[in-house]
Amino acid sequence: MALSEAAVKVQAALLERGLETPMLPSVYSSEERKDKIEHHMKEILTLMSLDLSDDSLADTPRRIAKMYVDEIFSGLDYENFPKITVIDNKMGFDEMVRVQDISLTSTCEHHLVTIDGTATIAYLPRKKIIGLSKINRIVRFFAQRPQVQERLTQQVLVALQTLLETKDVAVKMDAVHYCVKSRGVMDSTSSTTTTALGGIFKSNPATRAEFLHQ
C-alpha cells in the first residue's frame, strides 16, 4: 500500500530534523508481525512461570500481539497516518486557532508502560487551515508508538508545520508517566509538561504568553 502524500512529507521532515522515532524498515506484514510477537510472548510468559493452559491466559499472547500491531504501536506504520484535510485559507482568517485538552495515551519506550495525558495545540493560519479533528488524529498517531514525551511533542509540532506550511505552531503536553508512578520511585502525583514552540510562538513574547497561560 502506497503512503499518502501527507505521510511522506511528514516522515521526510522528521527524518531531516533527526526527530523520527528510532525504528528499522519493516520486512514483515502486519499478520506476520502478530504471529512472531505471539510466539515470543508465549516464551516470555512461560519464563515468568505463568500457565498458558489456563483459560484466562491461553489467548493472552495473541491479544498482546494484536494490541501492539493494531493499537498501541500502530503509529510505527505510516500506512496508518490519518487522512488529512487541509484547505486554502480563502477567508484570510489570521487569529490563533487553539485546541486544548486533547486526550493522549502513549507508551514509554524505556519500560513499555503507559503515558497518560493531554495536549494543547495552537497555530496562526497563513496559507492553509486544517480540519480540527485532524489535529487530534495527528496527536494520536504519534502517541501510538513507544515514545519519550519530549520527542512526541516535537513530532506533532513538525507534522503540523509541514502540513500547514507555516512555522507558527505551538504544542504543549501534560502527562503522567507510569514508569514513575507504578515502578521505581512510585510517585503517584507528579506530572511532566513539555512544550514545542515555532515561529511567532517562539519569537513573540505576547503570543507565547497567550498560548501558555490562556
From Swiss-Prot:
UniProt protein name: GTP cyclohydrolase 1
Family: Belongs to the GTP cyclohydrolase I family.
UniProt EC number: 3.5.4.16
An example Gene Ontology CC term for this record: cytoplasm
Catalyzed reaction equations: GTP + H2O = 7,8-dihydroneopterin 3'-triphosphate + formate + H(+)
GO molecular function, one term: zinc ion binding
InterPro entries: GTP-CH-I_C/QueF, GTP-CH-I_N, GTP_CycHdrlase_I, GTP_CycHdrlase_I_CS, GTP_CycHdrlase_I_dom
Assembly, per entry: Toroid-shaped homodecamer, composed of two pentamers of five dimers.
Biological processes per GO annotation: one-carbon metabolic process; tetrahydrobiopterin biosynthetic process; tetrahydrofolate biosynthetic process
Keywords for the protein's UniProt record, in alphabetical order: GTP-binding, Hydrolase, Metal-binding, Nucleotide-binding, One-carbon metabolism, Zinc
Amino-acid positions noted as binding Zn(2+) in the UniProt annotation, renumbered to this chain: 108, 111, 179
Pfam families assigned: GTP_cyclohydroI
Class of this enzyme: hydrolase
Pathway where this protein functions: Cofactor biosynthesis; 7,8-dihydroneopterin triphosphate biosynthesis; 7,8-dihydroneopterin triphosphate from GTP: step 1/1
